[in-house]
Amino acid sequence: MPHLAELVAKAKAAVEDAQDIAALDLVRVEYLGKKGHLTLQMTSLRELPAEERPAAGAVINQAKQEVQEALNARKEKLESAVLNARLAAETIDVSLPGRRMENGGLHPVTRTIERIETFFGELGFSVESGPEIEDDYHNFDALNIPAHHPARADHDTFWFDATRLLRTQTSGVQIRTMQEQQPPIRIIVPGRVYRNDYDQTHTPMFHQMEGLIVDRDISFTNLKGTLHDFLRNFFEEDLQIRFRPSYFPFTEPSAEVDVMGKNGKWLEVLGCGMVHPNVLRNVGIDPEIYSGFAFGMGMERLTMLRYGVTDLRAFFENDLRFLKQFK
């Protein structure tokens, strides 16, 4: 095989001349492919005497190995050049500012709840909570709402069975607190409540905040002063406020509180009243010694008034375009 060395030299030269991976692959096929020059050298072994074939075969295999090693080395070099060129084209300017981190924000209803908790916390109120799956005693009976009261109607309340329901108000926590604590009591109760209603100003689930004070010599004047201070603090302006006589089964006397809107119309914001003597008796508190006041307000409604939102359902639709306005 006098020309084997010449084939190897030509193959190595062709390898070095290849300028990209595609050209290099053509060289591989030309010399090491199924019909390549070096591969065909193996067919010449049958022309040799049997005793010479092993040595000749070893020489051919050595030649093929040299060419393969040259191919591997050239391929690595070409791939490295491609990578370096790409990295050079994608050079990062480390002096540029990094991407701005996108900060989250509190939901507007959560902002309202925390704002109210802060205000009443400074007045000495503690925050209480209770079960959302309630029994009819704590949700109705103990609050002076008898079985025939309209609030127990199926269209207002989500009932599980004859005695269990999704609470329609957080007032049940007031009952539980008065059963467990002796006066003086001063609490607020934020939480989710459920009513079977859905339109532009109502949703089946919404957030409510109850407030309760029970102590000696608590009067309606205390109630009015507390709510005046709260509303002016919450809306951050000297609002015109009025108390309208109303009816709630668990307070007597009862009132609804309105604020004057920017359009010159009165807007209802909450309900309140003096704790009904029957409610105090139901929890073992003597109404001849103690009195108290209670108030309740919808968090979504207050949030709508504070931020000028017109559709309650926007708070529950998870539209980031809407929510990012409150960050």
Curated annotation (Swiss-Prot):
Write down how the cofactor binds this protein. Answer: Binds 2 magnesium ions per tetramer.
Biological process (GO) annotations held by this record are: phenylalanyl-tRNA aminoacylation
Any single GO molecular-function term of the entry would be:
tRNA binding
Enzyme class name: ligase
Q: Source organism's superkingdom?
A: Bacteria
Task: Give a yes or no for keyword Metal-binding in this entry.
Answer: yes
Report whether Magnesium shows up as a keyword of the record: yes
Which InterPro entries does the protein's record reference? aa-tRNA-synth_II, aa-tRNA-synth_II/BPL/LPL, Phe-tRNA-synth_IIc_asu, Phe-tRNA_ligase_II_N, Phe_tRNA_ligase_alpha1_bac, Phenylalanyl-tRNA_Synthase, tRNA-bd_arm
What EC number(s) does its UniProt record assign? Answer: 6.1.1.20
Q: Which cofactor does it need?
A: Mg(2+)
Q: Which reaction does it catalyse?
A: tRNA(Phe) + L-phenylalanine + ATP = L-phenylalanyl-tRNA(Phe) + AMP + diphosphate + H(+)
Residues bound to Mg(2+) are 252
Keywords in alphabetical order, please.
Aminoacyl-tRNA synthetase, ATP-binding, Cytoplasm, Ligase, Magnesium, Metal-binding, Nucleotide-binding, Protein biosynthesis
GO cellular component term, pick one: cytoplasm
* Family according to the record: Belongs to the class-II aminoacyl-tRNA synthetase family. Phe-tRNA synthetase alpha subunit type 1 subfamily.
Q: What is this protein called?
A: Phenylalanine--tRNA ligase alpha subunit
Q: What is the lineage of its organism?
A: Bacteria, Pseudomonadati, Pseudomonadota, Gammaproteobacteria, Enterobacterales
